[in-house]
């Protein structure tokens, strides 16, 4: 399977996806990576530790989270996708379940969509991904 410019073998290999949450209320890192320079340093460290794909998320899905508008989520993830794409040669996954955010992320350079709802939340998501040719 090709993701970005890399070929991933589907048998006999394990791959590591690193998480870059750009949310102020993440349950796993509490918004540590909202700053561009700290985020880039974190991606660099994860690559050095063996990360194969970076997963960028802009909306917390912790228990009791507040639903963001597409515009709010796009404002968080698109600049980070662009800066990671410009600085590193690594496939970028976008963690979103909203088709509008996925479209913006794909335009910004995302190589994969990570939809935690499995294409069941947003009726347009499957169409957006199919038209883009990206993996999901």
Feature locations, PLM:
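N-terminal amphipathic alpha-helix/helix-capping segment at the start of soluble metabolic enzymes
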Residues: 1-21
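Short, well-ordered coil/turn segments that N-cap beta-strands
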Residues: 11-16, 51-52, 88-90, 109-111, ...
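Active-site mouth loops of central-metabolism enzymes
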Residues: 22-41, 66, 91-93
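Conserved anion-binding
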Residues: 24-28, 60-64, 101, 108, ...
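Alpha-helix-loop-beta-strand connector modules within alpha/beta enzyme cores
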Residues: 66-94, 99, 103, 127-136
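Catalytic beta/alpha-barrel core
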Residues: 88-97, 111-121
């Amino acid at each position: 399977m090709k993701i970005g410019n890399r070929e991933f073998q589907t048998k006999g290999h394990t791959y590591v996806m690193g998480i870059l949450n750009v949310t102020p209320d993440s349950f796993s890192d509490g918004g540590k990576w909202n700053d561009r320079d700290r985020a880039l340093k974190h991606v660099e460290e994860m690559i050095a530790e063996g990360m194969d794909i970076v997963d960028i998320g802009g909306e917390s899905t912790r228990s009791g989270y507040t639903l963001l508008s597409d515009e709010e989520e796009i404002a968080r993830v698109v600049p980070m996708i662009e800066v990671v794409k410009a600085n590193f040669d690594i496939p970028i996954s976008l963690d979103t379940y909203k088709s509008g955010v996925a479209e913006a992320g794909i335009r910004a350079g995302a190589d994969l969509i990570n939809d935690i709802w499995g294409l069941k939340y947003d009726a347009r998501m499957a169409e957006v991904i199919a038209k883009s040719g990206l993996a999901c």
